[in-house]
């Protein structure tokens, strides 16, 4: 296009001169009505004429003989770079004048009128073609039921383009139907022909855009991509299938349909969320996988809701049918610990040979909850990880497919969040194929009440993804669209949406009565001939298959199902681990158990600490200009390293750096994590003079180290946390961390935490080692910048408050193995260092929730020595009192147990009041699972002392409800554990700074009032 503009620029002086001369002639004529565009001074360069020149140039590029010889000569000269003054082949003004008719009013009027007529007709045809390309989908025959227009737009007339009376809008009329027009280069309807009659143009456009396929793509701002789609759908005869392809399609439809029929016969009263009404989805998915495998793809990761899931497991993933049928037997108990999940939520991982390509293909269907679309970012994160570990930077080996329902695709915000990750460098999966099962109803809700946009797929427009709507009762159209979708993704590495417009033969589930709310729709559905019968009749009529062959194929699959059903009756137990969607080969034993129940020391050699500290204090790149304030930070780090101390940021640096040396990939993601919300991290340095020149010193630590990824995320919690969870699913040998900007904001991702992180292992036997960093602390910053809601995480912890555990030699590790997640609140950098390293050195994986500090990041007392981090040291679940009070425990009047930042306020207040020998302060670094053994030791050490739990959070929040019950279990309810902290409240914190300090002063006074609880009932 840029070259065309340069050619047009060379034409500009000639056109301008011609216009001036032409206008002077017109002044002698009788008055007429002329309408000029804003670009009248440049008739060939703007408005309609510029389009004409553009078409002429494109036509000349394709075939120089298709244009007049004068244009051929002109374009040849201009294309060769000939100076404008030397261009040959364009007549001079004098030549033009000599060829004009005599200056009679009739002659002067008819010549330009004839030329204008030719241009106008050409542009009219071009506009008509463009109208079909832009709006043809509005009148496509998409609804199998013939009830609704799929787009729901009542303002779009059904005869938008398709009737003859509409031709006048484009400047054409019925008399032009047999007139032959040259086709523009923006269409492929001509095939090998460059001209067609208007009647044939309309017929071919109707076939391409207004039948069972509706295309939305003209909003894409890329000419190459638009041309690619036009070529795929406009070229005559391009959608033809050979007989072998049709037979394969029919066989797949048989399997899809008969599987649902078999389940309906055997378990008529069971919920299974069948696929009836959209049976074509199974052949559709298989067509995508076949085409992608043909183009070199090795791994497909799928995410989908419950509808049709069992069918996908059986006929796409190829899960053994007997194992699927076992899930319907209520008498079978699971051999695995945990709750398990309903059959239509389960996932699966399978490696097999793709029969269509004879290539190995790996398929993974990710387990998910009933929370619709929640699995979308999880699938994308897992896909990104699998691409990362394979070095698949272009997405040629690993791909994701997401299946959606129409109501959820339009209604759930996480869909939008996930789409907006698609082109971000650290989150892109190089294109996802989205399949929308558009059954035109959401449970009982009419789509006209469920969305404000014409289509459920309109959200995909935000990333310029082409949208292919297709009538699901036309299997061949569906197969072709899916094949094109796979090619699009492979060619452009961008998302694409296939909207399967279908219906739901039953209610929301098999027990539901849909006639209550959709009587007319379901009257039509009851009359609807199933797609298998429709297509089989068509194939038999064509002679592609015989009736006998069709019936034999049905009998063959029915026999397979019956044999599998018989085998399922021999099963004695269920194995949930057979449904694992993300296995870690070699990490566990063959039985899925940890190879040991021990954890090695988490400390590292001092020379390694010093080396990492030196790199963290420097800029590895030459001539890299950093900010002056950052220079001071790096200088401070070097001073700490030389003095063998670390603050929070340096301890984190040493954690990550040591793991990278051991070959462990570290990925830190979240809002503003590169610098850190509190400007403490600075893992990405920015040159102050060269735009976008950055340096990540962490990637310059060691030769052959693992890569370090630190990436600022979009302003999303739900989508991004789901993505990082999926990334952590792919491998146990990576430390994947998500940091909230403030801990308060994590709850917009509550669904991921509740449905996946907290309960994922119990439901799906799926380990995950994701780390959540949640900045937390009451610092007078108001109710939305104070609390990460630790009470919520503790309430979901599964350790029993009333069960006194047996203390074995490996109690600390086995306790971690039995819990659903680990909750810690570190009070010093060394604890943070050790707990992160322990996360990788454990022989299993559990989610780790860390309440990280804000003010402690720069607190002069919140530092650790190399001695606390060097070889042989470990994470301390409990840090006991080690001051004066610990030397004479019998004289200690009160023991204050606490966690996190409040420790430093307590120590300061104790010293101010001179109570160092009378009050002991013990810190719980690990809250859950509760360190029963170490807390018991402390309670026994101070057997006669008063026990207090002190927290800065309000009484109905924080840790008190969790720890109180466990303290009483340890103490056998023989001693009280008093509460010191803020009073109960609805909001997490006050918005008034003065009130904050009054509350702090009050509970600190109570904490060290040794007579406060005397005579009070517990």
Curated annotation (Swiss-Prot):
It catalyses: N(6)-[(R)-lipoyl]-L-lysyl-[protein] + 2-oxoglutarate + H(+) = N(6)-[(R)-S(8)-succinyldihydrolipoyl]-L-lysyl-[protein] + CO2. It is found in: Mitochondrion matrix. It holds the Pfam family 2-oxogl_dehyd_N. The keyword Disulfide bond does not apply. Mg(2+) binds at residues 406, 439, 441. One of its GO terms (molecular function) is metal ion binding. It is an enzyme of class 1 (oxidoreductase). GO terms for cellular component: mitochondrial matrix; mitochondrion; oxoglutarate dehydrogenase complex. The keyword Cell cycle does not apply. Gene3D superfamilies: 3.40.50.12470, 3.40.50.970, Multifunctional 2-oxoglutarate metabolism enzyme, C-terminal domain, TPP helical domain. 2-oxoglutarate dehydrogenase (E1-like) component of the 2-oxoglutarate dehydrogenase multienzyme complex (OGDHC) which mediates the decarboxylation of alpha-ketoglutarate in the tricarboxylic acid cycle. The OGDHC complex catalyzes the overall conversion of 2-oxoglutarate to succinyl-CoA and CO(2) while reducing NAD(+) to NADH. The OGDHC complex is mainly active in the mitochondrion. Involved in the inhibition of cell proliferation and in apoptosis. The OGDHC complex comprises multiple copies of three catalytic enzyme components, the 2-oxoglutarate dehydrogenase (OGDH/E1), the dihydrolipoamide dehydrogenase (DLST/E2) and the dihydrolipoamide dehydrogenase (DLD/E3). OGDHL/E1-like isoenzyme may replace OGDH in the OGDHC complex in the brain. This is 2-oxoglutarate dehydrogenase-like, mitochondrial.
């Amino acid at each position: 296009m840029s070259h065309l503009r340069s050619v047009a620029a060379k034409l500009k002086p000639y056109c301008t001169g011609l216009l001036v001369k032409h206008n002077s002639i017109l002044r002698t004529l009788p008055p007429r009505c002329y309408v000029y565009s804003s670009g009248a001074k440049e008739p060939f360069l703007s408005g309609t004429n510029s389009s004409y020149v553009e078409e002429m140039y494109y036509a000349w590029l394709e075939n120089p003989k298709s244009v007049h010889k004068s244009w051929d000569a002109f374009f040849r000269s201009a294309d060769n770079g000939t100076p404008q003054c030397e261009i040959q082949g364009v007549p001079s003004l004098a030549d033009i004048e000599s060829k004009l008719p005599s200056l009679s009013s009739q002659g002067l009027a008819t010549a330009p009128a004839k030329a204008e007529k030719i241009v106008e007709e050409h542009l009219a045809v071009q506009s008509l073609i463009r109208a079909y390309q832009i709006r043809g989908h509005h009148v496509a025959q998409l609804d199998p039921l013939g009830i609704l227009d799929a787009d729901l737009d009542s303002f779009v007339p059904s005869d938008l383009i398709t009737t003859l009376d509409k031709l006048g809008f484009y400047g054409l009329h019925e008399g032009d139907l047999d007139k032959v027009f040259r086709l523009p280069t923006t269409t492929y309807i001509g095939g090998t022909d460059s001209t067609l009659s208007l009647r044939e143009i309309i017929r071919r456009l109707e076939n391409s855009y207004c039948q069972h396929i509706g295309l939305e793509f003209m909003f894409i701002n890329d000419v190459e991509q638009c041309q690619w789609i036009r070529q795929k759908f406009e070229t005559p005869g391009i959608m033809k299938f050979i007989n072998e392809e049709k037979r394969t399609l029919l066989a797949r439809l048989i399997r899809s349909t008969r599987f649902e029929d078999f389940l309906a016969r055997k378990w008529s009263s069971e919920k299974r969320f069948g696929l009836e009404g959209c049976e074509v989805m199974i052949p559709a998915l298989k067509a995508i996988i076949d085409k992608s495998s043909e183009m070199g793809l090795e791994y497909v990761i799928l995410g989908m809701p419950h509808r049709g899931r069992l069918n996908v497991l059986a006929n796409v993933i190829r899960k053994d049918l007997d194992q699927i049928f076992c899930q319907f037997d209520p008498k079978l108990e699971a051999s695995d610990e945990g709750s398990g999940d309903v059959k239509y939520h389960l996932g699966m991982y399978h490696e097999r040979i793709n029969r269509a390509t004879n290539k190995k293909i790996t398929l993974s269907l990710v387990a998910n909850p009933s929370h619709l679309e929640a699995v979308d970012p999880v699938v994308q994160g897992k896909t990104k990880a699998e691409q990362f570990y394979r070095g698949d930077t272009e997405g040629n080996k690993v791909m994701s497919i997401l299946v959606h329902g129409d109501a959820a695709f339009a209604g759930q915000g996480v869909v939008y969040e996930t789409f907006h990750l698609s082109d971000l460098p650290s989150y892109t999966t190089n294109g996802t194929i989205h399949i929308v099962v558009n059954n035109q109803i959401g449970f009982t809700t009419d789509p006209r009440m469920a969305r404000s946009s014409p289509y459920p797929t309109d959200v995909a427009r935000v990333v310029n993804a082409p949208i292919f709507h297709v009538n699901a009762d036309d299997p061949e159209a569906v197969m072709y669209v899916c094949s094109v979708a796979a090619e699009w993704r492979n060619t452009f590495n961008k998302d694409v949406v296939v909207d399967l417009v279908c219906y739901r033969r039953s209610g929301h589930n098999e027990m539901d009565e849909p006639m209550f709310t959709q009587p007319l729709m379901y009257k039509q559905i009851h009359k609807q001939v199933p797609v298998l019968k429709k297509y089989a009749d068509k194939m038999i009529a064509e002679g592609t298959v015989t009736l006998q062959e069709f019936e034999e194929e049905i009998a063959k699959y029915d026999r397979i199902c019956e044999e599998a059903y018989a085998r399922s009756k021999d099963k004695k137990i269920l194995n949930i681990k057979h449904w694992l969607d993300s296995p870690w080969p070699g990490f566990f034993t063959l039985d899925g158990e940890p190879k040991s129940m021990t954890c090695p020391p988490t400390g590292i050699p001092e020379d390694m600490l010093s080396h990492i500290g030196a790199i963290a204090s420097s800029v590895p790149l030459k001539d890299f200009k950093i900010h002056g304030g950052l220079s001071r930070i790096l200088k401070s780090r070097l001073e700490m390293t030389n003095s063998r101390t670390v603050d929070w940021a340096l301890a984190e640096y040493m954690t990550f750096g040591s793991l990278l040396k051991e070959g462990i990939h570290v990925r830190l993601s979240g809002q503003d994590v590169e610098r850190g919300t509190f400007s403490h991290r600075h893992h990405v340095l920015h040159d102050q003079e060269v735009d976008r020149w950055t340096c990540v010193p962490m990637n310059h630590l060691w030769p052959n180290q693992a890569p370090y990824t630190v990436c600022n995320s979009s302003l999303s919690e739900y989508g991004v946390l789901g993505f990082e969870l999926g990334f952590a699913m792919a491998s146990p040998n990576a430390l994947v961390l998500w940091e909230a900007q403030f801990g308060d904001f994590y709850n917009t991702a509550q669904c991921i935490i509740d449905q996946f992180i907290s309960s994922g292992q119990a439901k799906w036997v799926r380990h995950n080692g994701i780390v959540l960093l949640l900045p937390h602390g009451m610092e007078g910053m108001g109710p939305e910048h104070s609390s990460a809601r630790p009470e919520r995480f503790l309430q979901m912890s599964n350790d029993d408050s009333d069960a006194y555990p047996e203390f074995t030699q490996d109690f600390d590790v086995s306790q971690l193995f039995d819990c659903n997640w680990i909750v810690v609140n570190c009070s010093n950098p060394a604890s943070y260092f050790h707990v992160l390293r322990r996360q990788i050195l454990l022989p299993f994986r559990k989610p780790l929730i860390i309440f990280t500090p804000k003010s402690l990041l720069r607190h002069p007392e919140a530092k650790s020595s190399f001695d606390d981090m060097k070889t042989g040291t470990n994470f301390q679940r409990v840090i006991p009192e080690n001051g004066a009070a610990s030397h004479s425990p019998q004289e200690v009047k009160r023991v204050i147990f606490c966690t996190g930042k409040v420790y430093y306020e307590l120590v300061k207040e104790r010293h101010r009041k001179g109570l160092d020998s009378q009050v002991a302060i013990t810190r719980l670094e690990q809250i859950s699972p509760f360190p029963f053994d170490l807390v018991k030791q402390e309670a026994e050490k101070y057997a006669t002392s008063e026990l207090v739990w002190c927290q800065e959070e309000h009484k109905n929040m924080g840790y008190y409800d969790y720890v109180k019950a466990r303290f009483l279990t340890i103490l056998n309810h023989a001693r009280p554990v008093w509460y010191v902290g803020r009073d109960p409240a609805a909001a997490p914190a006050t918005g008034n700074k003065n009130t904050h300090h009054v509350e702090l002063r009050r509970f600190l006074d109570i904490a060290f009032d040794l007579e406060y609880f005397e005579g009070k009932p517990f």
